[in-house]
Amino acid sequence: GAGAASCTPNPVNEGSSSTCTAVVNPVYAPGNWSGDCSGPTCILTNVTAARSVTANFVPTLNVDGSDAASRYQPVTDGQIIVRYMQGVRGAALVAGAGVAGAMVTDPAAMATYLYSLGAKLVIDGNGAIDAATDGLLVARYMLGFRGDALIANALGPTPRVRSTAVEIEAWLAALMP
């Protein structure tokens, strides 16, 4: 899964407090809490009855689960994403695209995760995952391209949900928190 929540202490003595922590799978980012907590942190105070909390997680394009220093690299994550969009699977998916500190190295696990992203990989929102457009947008964004340079000759056929650089950048930024 995307992660888990752990609260300490658990169970909570009546009238006491508990702090909940999200433990995130490395290809996800922490989201917000829901239920009896909201926002980025979860502290339950003066607990007098059962409480329910849910840790929410956000999928990312950090497909190898690498640390902050090597997260969202075009030569690793970007290359793997483009290859996946081209239909490459197995060892060829990750060949030459490894990075020290990657938490996910199994190509089958990466392909399964990318499959689970589904429509999130349709960067321009035209309904079809295409390495020549969506993959190019991912790679360019990871390389630092923004504005017109990001989208020049890189959008799929219409109708598209996202056609401007601002829309594409916002979509990709949400996948690379």
Label every model-predicted segment.
Residues 66-116, 126-177:
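Alpha-helical segments with a strong preference for the paired helices of cellulosomal dockerin domains
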Residues 23, 42-59:
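Conserved "repeat-terminator" motif of extracellular CCP/Sushi domains
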